[in-house]
Amino acid sequence: MSEPFGIVAGALNVAGLFNNCVDCFEYVQLGRPFGRDYERCQLRLDIAKARLSRWGEAVKINDDPRFHSDAPTDKSVQLAKSIVEEILLLFESAQKTSKRYELVADQQDLVVFEDKDMKPIGRALHRRLNDLVSRRQKQTSLAKKTAWALYDGKSLEKIVDQVARFVDELEKAFPIEAVCHKLAEIEIEEVEDEASLTILKDAAGGIDAAMSDAAAQKIDAIVGRNSAKDIRTEERARVQLGNVVTAAALHGGIRISDQTTNSVETVVGKGESRVLIGNEYGGKGFWDN
């Protein structure tokens, strides 16, 4: 964010500040020190942005005249403005921390990840969430911003955790809980494969209960197609109830939209036997030695 916060905040109403706030996510890149955690961390950043955007959609921030007043009298709108300003300051502080790191870090540690570095499923979710937020943004940011990078997980978690807490406050200030949950369901209605839903549910943990719950419900609907009334095992026998999605499937970008039903009355496993009531996707998994 190259424009000083005070200049941006003083020139915009609540709706303008909010749109600038959502735009801030677009300019954050993740550095190579994130390593294998890059994909999950990127999705957590995407989900935090989507949740903030969802609140704006729920209160109709770009259409409600209360949010376009330069001097709002509504107490809830005043509170919203204060919270959005705090989020902008959060990004400004994180950017300053990154700039200090860049002064002392080795050049190799300043390389950033790109979308192409994500696995196919993660990349598809990343793009889906970005497209969703872009459709909601109806105002162009007035602030001139440049891309900048985060280089450690603690800084990222500080942002997503604090944004989540700020959105908690925004949601409490306006009676929109039911609307937010419905919007979260709509956000993932086109995500039908179990692997993508599982990744979303994990990435949303602790920062977006509505999305996590919506993903969990869709997963349960898929898993619920596999059932057994009576399962008995002896010795080292193993029984898996539900689909198995292996690491090979996740890394290979296999899209799993499961519509099959697997149902048995009784399973008796003995010795070294292994029974799967469900489907397996990918290479070795449940059946590995």
UniProtKB/Swiss-Prot annotation:
Outcome of swapping residue 33 to H: Converts its specificity to [Het-S]
Record-linked Pfam families: HeLo, HET-s_218-289
Presence of keyword Cytoplasm: yes
Positions in coiled-coil regions: none
Recorded domain comment: The globular domain is dispensable for prion formation and incompatibility function. However, the het-S globular domain, but not the het-s globular domain, is essential for programmed cell death.
Organism of this sequence: Podospora anserina (Pleurage anserina)
UniProt-listed InterPro entries: HeLo_dom, HeLo_sf, Het-s_prion_dom
Stretches for region Prion domain (PrD): 218-289
Protein name, entry field: Heterokaryon incompatibility protein s
